[in-house]
Amino acid sequence: MALDLSDVKRIAHLARIETSDDEAAQTLAQLNNFFSLVEQMQAVDTTGIEPQAHPLSAVRDMVQRLREDVVTETDRRADYQRPAPATENGLYLVPKVIE
């Protein structure tokens, strides 16, 4: 996948980023280099390779020290919502700003 200058300018416009022609050209080169790298990685045949959740254990004989998945803090939602001007069902109510 390769972008052209009009793609970069359109993306910048959608993101509300003002760019000069030189900046757009530099960004185009960087994005196309990135997409080229992604295409190279996707072209690698990974058939039969098991995904690694902890890649360090494949390189070294080490055990990952993972903490227990337990709650360590109390629920303070009510405390945080008490000073709010308006809440409902645990959510903050705010004025509508977009129609």
From Swiss-Prot:
Keyword Protein biosynthesis: yes
InterPro entries in the record: Asp/Glu-ADT_sf_sub_c, GatC
Listed GO biological process terms: glutaminyl-tRNAGln biosynthesis via transamidation; regulation of translational fidelity; translation
Family matches, as SUPFAM superfamilies: Glu-tRNAGln amidotransferase C subunit
Quaternary state and interactors: Heterotrimer of A, B and C subunits.
Cited function: Allows the formation of correctly charged Asn-tRNA(Asn) or Gln-tRNA(Gln) through the transamidation of misacylated Asp-tRNA(Asn) or Glu-tRNA(Gln) in organisms which lack either or both of asparaginyl-tRNA or glutaminyl-tRNA synthetases. The reaction takes place in the presence of glutamine and ATP through an activated phospho-Asp-tRNA(Asn) or phospho-Glu-tRNA(Gln).
Name by which UniProt lists this protein: Aspartyl/glutamyl-tRNA(Asn/Gln) amidotransferase subunit C
Species the sequence originates in: Cupriavidus taiwanensis (strain DSM 17343 / BCRC 17206 / CCUG 44338 / CIP 107171 / LMG 19424 / R1) (Ralstonia taiwanensis (strain LMG 19424))
Gene name as annotated: gatC
